[in-house]
Amino acid sequence: MKSNQMILVCMMAIAFVCTSVPAWACSSAVISGKVTPDGRPLLWKNRETGHLKNHMVYVKGEKYDFVANVNSDNFPKLKEAWVGSNTAGFALMNTQSYNLEKGDIADDDRGPKNGEVIYRALEICATVADFCHFLDTITKPSGI
């Protein structure tokens, strides 16, 4: 019972924070398996984006199949995912922050690059070590 109460308190706090200030970045939460009934961690994501039409898809990946949230208006033409989990149990999500130093990357170029990286990682990564190796091998600057 304590686990359910802790999850409820966390979700209420997140909801309060997300609705009390204007937000132009994605909201997310990672909930430890220590407080879930089955011991598995939870990922929670809310997309605050101009792409209002989103849906979940099942993708036959190169190495691993996965379920992901995609923009409805440009999928499958663009291979972008914003949160997902693959058949190896690897899960990944993006949160876009617009208050960081931009450097040479325009806001319009930052989001889609995140989506491309997440889509590809869900196809080929099974572990955090795989993902670190993947990040080390992509062309820099990557636009993420």
Walk through the language-model features, giving the residues of each.
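Serine/proline-rich low-complexity intrinsically disordered segments, especially terminal tails, linkers
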Residues: 5, 20-22
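A surface/extracellular/periplasmic glyco- and lipid-processing/surface-interacting theme
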Residues: 115-144
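Bacterial N-terminal signal peptides
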Residues: 9-19
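Sequence-pattern detector for short linear motifs
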Residues: 5, 48-50, 123
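A contiguous strand-loop segment
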Residues: 24-113, 137-144
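A generic structural signal for short, solvent-exposed coil/turn residues
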Residues: 15-17, 35, 84, 131
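Bacterial N-terminal signal peptides that target proteins for export
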Residues: 1-10
